[in-house]
Structure formats: C-alpha cells, structure tokens
Design a protein with these regions (language model features):
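A short local loop/turn or secondary-structure capping micro-motif enriched for an aromatic residue
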Residues: 72, 112-114, 140-145
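Bacterial N-terminal signal peptides that target proteins for export
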Residues: 2-13
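Surface-exposed, charged secondary-structure patches
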Residues: 78-126
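C-terminal motif of bacterial Sec signal peptides marking the signal peptidase cleavage site
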Residues: 21-24
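Core segments of small alpha/beta cavity-forming domains
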Residues: 29-75
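Low-complexity, intrinsically disordered terminal/linker segments enriched in charged
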Residues: 134-160
Length: 160
C-alpha cells in the first residue's frame, strides 16, 4: 500500500514537472514574424512597409526595404510616394520557412478606389543589415507552391 502511494506521488510529481517545463519552454520562444532585428524592425513591419511603398509607387522606400536595393538601376532612387493611398482592410497569412525566411500572403479585402484587389506573395529574409524583402519581384511559383498548401504559421489582419 505504501509502495502504491509512493508510485502515485512520484508519477504525479513527474507529470507536474513535465507540464511546468513544457510551459516554461513554450513561453520563451518568440515567433519569427514578431522578432525584431538590430534596427528594431520585425519581418511583418518590413512586409507591410513594402506593400504600402509599392501601392504608393515610392521607389525610394522600396529600394531601402529590398535586399541589394542600393544596387538597383531600374527604379528611381529619388522618387518618393506618388500618392498617399493605403490598404485599410487586409488579411495576411504568414509562413515561416526557416529561421531566416518568412513568406507572406497579403490579400487586400477592400482596396482603395480605382485599385484592383491585391494578392501579393512577399518573401522577407534575415540579412546582416536586418530583415529585408528578398526582391521587388514576387517569389518564384515553386517557392509559393511549397508553402501555399501548408497551414500558415500565423494569420493577422488590419483589424488586429
């Protein structure tokens, strides 16, 4: 009888310890999409800034946000925003590919007047200069296909 009580007590203690340990470890992890780089930017902020700059045709900002933007010879480095449009209602699906790459699927629900509904795929990568949008061009179709049929790591919208 004493052995049975001792076994139950040890089993209960072990379960409680495992539960406590898993809760402690789970809370210490930061979602990659919310992680800040040295400049204090998150991948999500970079993606949203890029989407806004693209809508406003703000080449100057786009070149700051993309990898190797300073080497670009197509976009005008001095061209700021050509309008002040913004997406008021959107939904974003976030797919963490690995610790250095996050893919975003941006969907505008109600685009600004005279603008078509926008569905964009944007790849944000970690660089030695912080998080950057990988390229002004959309990711390759095979890269999109790799994540599009999986469950998003996270979802958020303009209402969050």
């Amino acid at each position: 009888m004493v052995k049975t009580k001792l076994k139950k007590l040890m089993l209960s203690s072990l379960c409680a310890g495992a539960l406590f340990l898993s809760a402690a470890c789970g809370n210490s992890e930061t979602n990659v999409g919310e992680e800040k780089d040295k400049q204090g930017h998150t991948p999500r902020e970079m993606m949203l800034d890029f989407v806004k700059a693209d809508l406003q045709r703000d080449h100057k900002t786009i070149l700051k946000l993309v990898v190797d933007g300073e080497k670009d010879t197509i976009l005008d480095k001095n061209q700021g925003p050509k309008n002040n449009l913004s997406y008021k209602d959107y939904k974003v699906k976030e797919y963490v590919v690995d610790k250095d790459t996050i893919m975003y699927n941006f969907i505008s629900k109600k685009p600004p007047k005279n603008i078509d509904k926008e569905i964009k795929w944007i790849r944000v990568v970690r660089t030695d200069k912080g998080f950057k949008v990988r390229s002004y061009a959309a990711p390759y179709r095979n890269e999109i296909d790799e994540v599009a049929n999986t469950k998003p790591t996270n979802e958020f919208s303009s209402k969050d």
